[in-house]
Amino acid sequence: MAFLKKSLFLVLFLGLVSLSVCEEEKRENEEEKNEQEEDDREERNEEKRLLGMIPLAISAISSLSKLG
């Protein structure tokens, strides 16, 4: 009977360790995914800012060409 208890405790302990390792890996994967999404958002925002400056640049160039 004591052997069965020890075996059962060992199995439960190893199961919990395995579960915690899987949860940790899952958490790390989610963090990497969130960081990647944040980087992508920042890149899109930079592109939008640059595209928003195009009309201003065209306006400045046309003003300069009228003067010169």
Swiss-Prot record:
Transmembrane segments: none annotated. Pfam families: FSAP_sig_propep (PF03032). It is found in: Secreted. Its main location: secreted. One of its GO terms (biological process) is defense response to fungus. The modification Leucine amide is found at L67. Keywords: Amidation, Amphibian defense peptide, Antibiotic, Antimicrobial, Cleavage on pair of basic residues, Fungicide, Immunity, Innate immunity, Secreted, Signal. This is Medusin-DA1. It comes from Agalychnis dacnicolor (Giant Mexican leaf frog).
